[in-house]
A protein has these predicted regions:
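Low-complexity, Gly/Ser/Thr/Pro- and Asn/Asp-enriched, turn/coil-prone segments
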Residues: 1-40
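C-terminal, surface-exposed recognition/capping segments
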Residues: 4-5, 31-32, 36-56, 60-151
Length: 151
């Protein structure tokens, strides 16, 4: 699982001070209310690429899946929705997400998982609800789950 730096907790303390470095040095969830809704200023598009990615949330020897890898996983499900996600070998739950304001949303109804891919000012991730699933772009300051792949 994710390293224990405070960011693995869904109820960690919050701060509105954006980080100017790739590693904030604390476990607080960084909130924001202005564009581009990133926890870091300036943005860095190369934080989570590969096992040696800066600020890689995965343990040593593991990495986040790419958008293409998540898409391949999604298309293997029996159904394109949260039931398919949980019915897959990964047993992906609808854990909800943490908004850029630090609040929890969608617990029990939405599942979201970061990829290592970016799209302009946004991060790419897999999302699903009871009626649909697919890749989407989300604010980098938001918080969704991670699943790590052994490299």
């Amino acid at each position: 699982g994710r390293g224990a730096d405070g960011h693995e907790k869904r109820d960690s303390e919050t701060t509105s001070t954006l980080s100017t470095t790739d590693t904030p040095g604390h476990g607080d969830f960084i909130t924001t209310s202005s564009s581009p809704n990133d926890w870091r200023s300036p943005q860095n598009d190369n934080l989570w690429q590969g096992v040696d990615g800066v600020n890689n949330p995965c343990p040593v020897g593991f990495r986040l899946p790419t958008e293409a890898e998540w898409e391949a996983e999604r298309t293997s499900w029996d159904s394109n929705d949260s039931a398919g996600a949980f019915g897959s070998p990964l047993k992906l739950p609808v854990a909800g997400y943490r908004g850029v304001d630090g609040s929890l949303y969608g617990v029990g109804s939405y599942g979201g998982y970061w990829s290592s891919s970016v799209d302009g000012a946004s991060a790419r991730g897999l999302g699903f609800v009871s009626s649909d699933a697919g890749m989407g772009s989300d604010y980098r300051a938001g918080g969704v789950s991670v699943r790590c792949l052994k490299d």
